[in-house]
Amino acid sequence: MNFYILTLFPDMVMNGLKSSITGRAISKGIINAEAVDIRDYTLDRDRRVDDYPYGGGAGMLMEAQPVYDAYKAVIGMMKNVENIDYKNCRRPRVVYMTPKGKTFDQKMAQELAGEESLIFLCGHYEGIDERVIDEIVTDRVSIGDYVLTGGELPAMVMID
């Protein structure tokens, strides 16, 4: 199984995943995990990924452009690594980690385990520009009725 994690903190994700049993599964090639740094896809020289919400409101959102470009890069990686022709099959599932999502449980874990690949989208700030969520996300998932600083820990929980 292949996991692609779109994140602002790739080192945090990979250090967590390379520990314990998950780390052994990665080193033996049983699973593959790639953390993709969304900042690598920003057009801003300062690598900023946040902006004010369109129409106003409190807080900052992750911008659509770097998130979408990171997603497109992962699709490109998947074509190369997995040798899949995505024109003739359904697109991979993209799991957006959000406290507003469906609660992750054993039934969902078994369902997702049947996928060849999963892309996890880890948000920060007040969330991600809704336009990119509407375009690429297939599943909105929460690991519980509480708020965390980002989606990295929930993604690691689900991968584990």
Give short role names for the model-derived ranges.
Residues 128, 132-160:
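Structured adenosyl-cofactor binding patch, chiefly the S-adenosyl-L-methionine
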